[in-house]
């Protein structure tokens, strides 16, 4: 692998990695979080032993980075209940279903919920308009020939974009 490729975060040194691994291995046996982290680390090492193609490794790496980012975004809202709403990105604002989605989202916000949609237009936009930007998450998947996020959620820190799903 070329080490000159641009990275979003610098790689930790071998000493830093070993230090983190030692801390993990020294965790008490009854530490559930440490046990899960050990399993994740073992799985990652098995990926190396599997001799995967470089493109497969890049997919795994990107997917893990995207998940870590999404967890950081959602973490600040752990105390809020959320409802995921699925629907067509092609539903027009004059469609009765658009209006129903808008009203439903407005009503669930009154009950203390936030909405999660794919973040595009159609039903997704109706839900985010009904809930308002402050009560909306967009979980967008980059697809060829698809539209971007709707105006309500675009450029919002609660818009999370995934390449892989």
Where are these regions (language model features)?
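Conserved phosphate- and dinucleotide-binding cores of soluble alpha/beta proteins
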Residues: 146-165
């Amino acid at each position: 692998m070329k080490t000159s490729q641009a990275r979003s975060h610098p790689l930790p040194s071998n000493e830093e990695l070993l230090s983190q691994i030692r801390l993990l291995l020294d965790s008490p046996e009854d530490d559930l979080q440490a046990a899960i982290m050990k399993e994740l680390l073992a799985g990652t090492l098995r990926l190396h032993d599997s001799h995967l193609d470089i493109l497969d490794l890049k997919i795994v790496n990107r997917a893990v980075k995207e998940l870590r980012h999404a967890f950081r975004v959602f973490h600040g809202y752990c105390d809020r209940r959320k409802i995921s709403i699925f629907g067509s990105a092609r539903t027009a604002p004059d469609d009765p279903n658009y209006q129903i989605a808008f009203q439903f989202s407005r009503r669930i916000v009154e009950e203390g919920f936030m909405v999660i949609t794919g973040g595009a237009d159609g039903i997704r936009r109706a839900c985010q308009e009904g809930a308002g930007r402050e009560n909306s998450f967009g979980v967008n998947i980059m697809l060829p020939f698809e539209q971007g996020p709707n105006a309500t959620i675009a450029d919002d820190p609660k818009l999370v974009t995934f390449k892989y799903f």
